[in-house]
């Protein structure tokens, strides 16, 4: 899945966090590239006729190619490449810039927003992209629950959307909404999508090429294998330098790193980042550089609050002991976050605190000294005693029914961090008398959506505007019934949190809104259902002999894969092209890329709302 912005100014992170963030950033290089197609001979091989192909090896499969359903980082990244959004984010510093809309203005009461739609954007089938396409997209989401699956939170407050002319879009709101310049919704061609029947089941993966108006055109797809795109030579901002872009799935990230060494690919980001061992093994290698930049995701431990639907029906089998806040707090007090950063991430991360990473300083939250659940095993044991879970003669924590506590922790089989942290949890919680079973699966979707877990490794990539990742913890995000799929991340439903969410959504003053967002994070922290352990860096590596230049985001200490836009792939320049404009420079020839996509939860990428099989981001 994806998310959004708060432009320009913002409060800086607390001093000690800023210092840790800078230390964790390490040497932040900016670059990228790519090459090999399917049976990659060398990274520089193209498709013939002089075509240049950029191949991105990813560690995540596609959940859906429908922009109305997709939530995984890979899928939403593809949609950013193939469809325009009303606005975009500047690669330099994340401030809002024009996209399909060239300008926008609000009425004095902030309830009517008028967007001017550019006249130089065409769909890849030759038809003009107009305001009618945007109006139809939003109206479909407002009237069809299936079409609102991925991004429905953006239109829930819309009263009416019209297109008075081909270049004018008007959105009327029920109440003020602060995200009107950060609507993370791909605009689709009405003349194509109005033929679709059931939006809840249509995955847009049968007929190619797919009509779009982004910098690339989606031309082919094979599930769990590859996604192929071609450069849109008529893209209004200018055609990409590469003729083809291929995302190729790698389940084994060591194999992806090996491919980088061989020159079969030009860039590797890991799963979702390189492990310290992988990164260290690449340092000093000829023609390879490691980029270590502050990330935009969090790595957390989510606790099942008791899965339920909007109709009140409870389902799943979460351990009832976790409904006691003292138990939840005790568990987190027995987690040594510093050890996780030092030993698991080996310094390539920052200790966790609030829900939003310190990279977004205006929204970054840090608990007060009195509020913080610092590492305190003795205090954790005391809380468990107070909650009635005392140790028996065997040293096991038991409830009033005499049954020992044994929690199932859902983890991603493809994420080495989940497994490493899981072993520490077994040690730390074992000292409290609590047993845990690591349930590491390739596909965490089914048990997650069914509420059949006690705790789970969780993670999302956060956009400049945090509204989306905040919305997934509201009561409105719950599934309508146990058989439906909601947008909820972890079945949290808390009235105080919901009230704060509504307040920030309607607050146009940036400072006041940021304060409300911090209060929301404080509430999440106190309830203990979302415990952020770390903010991992984006650790990537690329071949300097295969890339001329590529854009990082932000331009200073930024990441390459999983950006809030299409800048990296759109700007990438083959090393032998003679065109080094518009990007971070290096040397090389670009033609193979391994961007290890984020796997669901622990990886930090978006948690798939609709299909959680193995992935993140939302953006």
Question: Model segments located where?
Answer:
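N-terminal lobe/hinge region of extracytoplasmic solute-binding protein
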Residues: 57-108, 139, 211
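Alpha-helical secondary-structure segments
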Residues: 55, 130-137, 170-172, 214-215, ...
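Secretory targeting and sorting signals
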Residues: 2-44, 591-612
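Aromatic- and charge-enriched surface segment that lines or borders ligand/interaction sites
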Residues: 102-147, 170, 247, 256-259, ...
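Detector for C-terminal structural segments
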Residues: 47-49, 222, 296-299, 332-367, ...
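Surface-exposed binding/hinge segments that line
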Residues: 116, 150-196
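Gly/Pro-rich hinge or "lid" segments in bacterial periplasmic/extracellular proteins
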Residues: 185-240, 244, 377-378, 382, ...
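Extracellular/periplasmic solute-recognition and catalytic clefts
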Residues: 148-151, 160-162, 219-230, 246-314, ...
């Amino acid at each position: 899945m994806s998310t959004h912005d708060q432009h320009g100014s913002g409060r800086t992170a607390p001093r000690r966090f800023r210092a840790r963030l800078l230390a964790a950033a390490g040497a932040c290089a900016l670059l990228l590239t790519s090459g090999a197609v399917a049976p990659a001979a060398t990274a520089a091989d193209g498709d013939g006729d002089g075509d240049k192909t950029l191949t991105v090896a990813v560690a995540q499969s596609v959940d859906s190619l429908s922009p109305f359903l997709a939530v995984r980082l890979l899928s939403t990244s593809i949609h950013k490449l193939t469809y325009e959004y009303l606005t975009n984010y500047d690669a330099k510093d994340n401030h809002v810039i024009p996209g399909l809309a060239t300008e926008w203005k609000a009425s004095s009461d902030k309830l009517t927003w008028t967007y001017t739609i550019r006249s130089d954007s065409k769909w890849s089938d030759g038809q003009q992209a107009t305001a009618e396409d945007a109006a139809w997209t939003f109206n479909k989401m407002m009237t069809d629950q299936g079409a609102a699956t991925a991004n429905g939170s953006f239109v829930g407050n819309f009263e009416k959307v019209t297109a008075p002319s081909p270049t004018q879009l008007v959105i009327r709101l029920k109440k003020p909404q602060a995200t009107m310049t950060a609507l993370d919704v791909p605009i689709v061609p009405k003349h194509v999508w109005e033929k679709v029947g059931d939006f809840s089941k249509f995955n847009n993966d049968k007929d190619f090429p797919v009509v779009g108006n982004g910098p690339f055109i989606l031309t082919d797809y094979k599930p769990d294998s590859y996604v192929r795109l071609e450069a849109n030579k008529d893209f209004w901002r200018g055609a990409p330098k590469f003729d083809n872009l291929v995302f190729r799935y790698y389940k084994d990230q060591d194999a992806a790193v090996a491919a980088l060494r061989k020159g079969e690919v030009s860039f590797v980001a890991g799963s979702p980042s390189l492990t310290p061992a992988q990164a260290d093994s690449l340092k000093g290698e000829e023609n390879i550089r490691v980029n270590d930049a502050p990330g935009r995701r969090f790595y957390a431990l989510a606790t099942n609050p008791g899965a339920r639907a909007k109709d009140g029906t409870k389902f799943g089998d979460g351990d009832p002991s976790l409904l006691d806040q003292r138990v939840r707090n005790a568990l987190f007090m027995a987690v040594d976050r510093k050890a996780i950063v030092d030993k698991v991430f080996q310094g390539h991360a920052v200790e966790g605190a609030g829900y939003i990473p310190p990279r977004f300083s205006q929204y970054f939250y840090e608990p007060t000294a009195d509020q913080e659940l610092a590492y305190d095993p003795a205090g954790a044991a005391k809380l468990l005693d107070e909650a009635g879970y005392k140790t028996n003669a065997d040293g096991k924590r038991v409830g009033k029914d005499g049954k020992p506590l044994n929690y199932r922790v859902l983890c991603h089989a493809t994420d080495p961090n989940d497994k490493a942290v899981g072993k520490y949890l077994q040690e730390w919680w074992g000292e409290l008398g609590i047993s845990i079973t690591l349930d590491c699966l390739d596909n965490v979707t089914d048990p997650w959506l069914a509420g059949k877990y006690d705790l789970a490794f969780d993670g999302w990539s956060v956009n400049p505007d945090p509204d989306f990742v905040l919305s997934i913890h509201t009561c409105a995000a719950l599934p309508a019934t146990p058989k439906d799929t909601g947008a909820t991340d972890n079945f949290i439903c808390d009235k105080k949190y919901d009230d704060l969410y509504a307040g920030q959504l309607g607050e146009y003053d940036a400072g006041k809104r940021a304060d409300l967002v911090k209060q929301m994070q404080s509430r999440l922290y106190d309830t203990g259902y979302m415990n952020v352990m770390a903010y991992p860096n984006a650790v990537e590596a690329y071949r300097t002999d295969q890339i001329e230049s590529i854009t990082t985001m932000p331009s200073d200490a930024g990441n390459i894969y999983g950006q809030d836009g299409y800048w990296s792939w759109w700007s990438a320049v083959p090393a032998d092209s003679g065109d080094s404009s518009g990007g971070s420079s290096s040397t090389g020839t670009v033609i193979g890329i391994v961007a290890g996509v984020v796997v669901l939860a622990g990886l930090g990428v978006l948690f798939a709302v609709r299909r959680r099989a193995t992935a993140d981001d939302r953006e």
